[in-house]
């Protein structure tokens, strides 16, 4: 196509700048033969209407270690690594016998964990940057401030409902476990000991559940707020087998990470539900695949959905 011709988007029919690789209105990727443009490095394209896509040239849009949702775990792991090292140095200074070496082993364990976590974090960020600036994305959009606030509120509400359901099951579960353990321990003295043992075990399990549930709820809410802590609307970038969403990157591969389902859930809010699997210990194991689809992007997402589903396990 000549450089002075403005491409017409095949999905929304809007006219775009000749340098665009993606539609400024709906985020659809154009034919790769068009002149290329690094969306995240280029000058901002001013949209004539609020609902149109604006490709920001702000460097904060690019993935980095410090804006990754899990960056906040680094200081915690660092502190857990330094503390046993300090104990080891203190123990050696006072000529303690055995426990300094136990502290040294704990230090090495946390150091190994910290290095693995940093390696995974760096790898995820590097892959995300390469993906965003490549020709692979099929569709991308950035939430408006109102859409981002709506998404945050929906995620917080959904998380609170999930924790309420879990809390309703957790206390009876621990009470049941306590009853069973109390019965087993009390049965050593026969039936006479089993009955009070069961009662004491049930009470202990109930109290333990009541204590544990608020702690677990607080940790869950803290994690969820960390994932959605930024006030800046985030990018969604999608390609077959690859997703960049909320500053996290997921790629289906043959090693362990895989896509298990991609569906469009239409209701009061429309969600793109992406089911992923990753081995335990992987940084992608906690990837959030619930993506709010703005109304302005719905037709485009429906158009590319079959291509996004190509890498679902068992369907490729």
Curated annotation (Swiss-Prot):
Membrane topology classification: Multi-pass membrane protein
Keyword set includes Cell membrane: yes
Subcellular location: Cell membrane
One GO CC term on file: plasma membrane
Keywords attached to this entry: Cell membrane, Membrane, Transmembrane, Transmembrane helix
Top-level taxon of the source organism: Bacteria
Coiled-coil stretches: none
Membrane-spanning segments: 74-94, 99-119, 166-186, 188-208
Protein's UniProt name: Uncharacterized protein slr0273
């Amino acid at each position: 196509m000549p450089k002075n011709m403005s491409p017409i988007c095949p999905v929304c029919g809007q006219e775009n700048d000749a340098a665009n690789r993606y539609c400024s209105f709906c985020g659809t990727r154009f034919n790769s033969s068009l002149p290329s443009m690094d969306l995240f490095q280029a000058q901002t394209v001013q949209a004539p209407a609020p609902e149109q896509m604006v490709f920001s040239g702000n460097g904060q849009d690019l993935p980095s270690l410090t804006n990754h949702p899990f960056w906040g775990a680094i200081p915690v792991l660092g502190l857990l690594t330094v503390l046993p090292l300090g104990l080891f140095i203190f123990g050696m200074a006072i000529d303690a016998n055995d426990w300094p070496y136990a502290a040294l082993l704990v230090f090495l364990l946390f150091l190994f964990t910290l290095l693995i976590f940093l390696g995974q974090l760096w790898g995820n960020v590097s892959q995300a940057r390469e993906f965003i600036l490549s020709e692979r994305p099929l569709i991308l959009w950035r939430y408006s401030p109102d859409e981002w606030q709506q998404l945050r509120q929906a995620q917080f509400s959904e998380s609170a409902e999930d924790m309420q359901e879990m809390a309703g099951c957790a206390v009876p579960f621990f009470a049941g476990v306590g009853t069973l353990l109390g019965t087993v321990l009390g049965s050593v003295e026969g039936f006479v000991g089993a009955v009070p043992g069961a009662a004491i075990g049930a009470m202990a399990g109930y109290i333990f559940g009541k204590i544990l549930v608020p702690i677990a709820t607080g940790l869950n809410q803290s994690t969820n707020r960390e994932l959605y802590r930024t006030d800046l609307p985030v990018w969604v970038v999608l390609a077959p087998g690859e997703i960049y969403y909320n500053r996290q990157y997921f790629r289906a591969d043959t090693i362990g990470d895989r896509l298990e389902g991609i569906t469009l859930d239409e209701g009061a809010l429309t969600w793109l539900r992406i089911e992923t699997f990753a081995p335990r210990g992987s940084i992608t194991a906690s990837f959030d695949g619930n993506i709010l689809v703005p109304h302005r992007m719905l037709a485009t997402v429906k158009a590319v959905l079959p291509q996004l589903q190509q890498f679902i396990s068992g369907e490729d």
